[in-house]
Amino acid sequence: MKKNWIVLILLIVSFCSTQIPIYAFTNSRKAYEKTGKVIWEVNIKEKIVAITFDDGPHPVFTPQILDILAKYNAKATFFVAGNKVKRFPAILKRQVKEGHEIANHTYSHIYDKNITSAKLTAELDQTDEIIKQISGYKPTLYRPVGGLHNDLIINTAIQNGKLVILWSWHQDPQDWRNPAASKISKYITKGVKPGNIILLHDWNGSEFSQSSQTVKALESIMRYFKNNDYKCVTVSEMLYRSIKVIPAPFDPFYQ
């Protein structure tokens, strides 16, 4: 049911893409949100948030993150790199088994403002195929590396059956820079609001790193959410429960 909801969104967005003029990158968020092509956060009153992790799976940190999420009965969305999934398939199997969402973050973690549609399609397809071989399903969500987005990237994603997910602007603690765990947790909790999409990274440092500030911060973040009645759900779950997920002209609540 929830997957069908995402498909419906993509169909509506695809229709809008043919009816609404292409916007330049400089128009960015306002233009893309108006058409429903990109999601930064969700307009919802429920005290739910979507916590997301990019760049994994990591052989040490991702299992530690999964342990913490399980402790608090929280669900997350993992935007995985295909080349890492290929190396650590057992971790992805665990993520799926424990009810987390797997989303596409390209195969080789490519960041290129001049990327062609053909190259991006190949990156998405290769990652989709690996995920499907391991989990049995093809992801419907995609996050561009570094949040890099323009018309070509977004429209290519839509043409490949992907809804583009970014993150709430005030919910990026830049944990990849390895700040103190207390700074990461404070950054997230001080401004949290219902419908926020939170950006974190489960791949920090190298494959052989043994300590992650993100993992250290996560326990504190989860404790705060629990004490303040916030529930962590997947991105798709939050979209499904939102009344403001489709473009306004198609929204039955639109006035």
Model-inferred region functions:
Residues N27-Y111, K119, E123-I130, S135, ...:
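Active-site beta->alpha N-cap acidic-glycine motif
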Residues I110-I115, P173-D175, G205-F208:
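A short acidic, helix-capping loop that chelates divalent metal ions and anchors anionic groups
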Residues F53, V80-G82, N104-T106, P144-G146, ...:
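A cross-domain feature marking catalytic cores of carbohydrate-active enzymes
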